[in-house]
Amino acid sequence: MASLRYRRFLKLCEEWPVDETRVGRDLGAFIRQRVAQAFREGESTQVDDPDACDEMYASLNRMNTNYYREKYPRLQDTSFTEVTAEEYKMVLASDNLKQMEEMKKGMWKRLRDKFNVKPSEENS
């Protein structure tokens, strides 16, 4: 029975897309890591709580098959801010987040980072 669960989770991992623009923050990559941790021994792994494992698989599978998107259809593909899903993807990309963090830095911090001055050298 554990081998069946393992194969179902592997199939789910294959179907779940990985967003390369969200390095370290992608749900697909996180799910793959968790499956690798939970099934370290592959098909011979013993599952401690089979009911919880099956429930987790069912929940992830519903998300993967867009069950809730079809059950609760939206009239428009925008949020309350009138921003589309594509615009959200662009804003939440790791490259854009790095640029925004760089913009948040003050002028002195940017210059110090640019010239690689360490705080201890600054005081001496």
Curated annotation (Swiss-Prot):
Task of the protein: Required for the assembly of the ubiquinol-cytochrome c reductase complex (mitochondrial respiratory chain complex III or cytochrome b-c1 complex). May play a role in the modulation of respiratory chain activities such as oxygen consumption and ATP production. May be involved in cytochrome b translation and/or stability.
Record flagged with keyword Lipid metabolism: no
A Pfam family assignment: UQCC2_CBP6
Protein name, per record: Ubiquinol-cytochrome-c reductase complex assembly factor 2
Any GO CC annotation of this UniProt entry: mitochondrial matrix
Transmembrane segments annotated in the record for this chain: none
Transit peptide: 1-13
Protein location: Mitochondrion matrix, Mitochondrion nucleoid; Mitochondrion
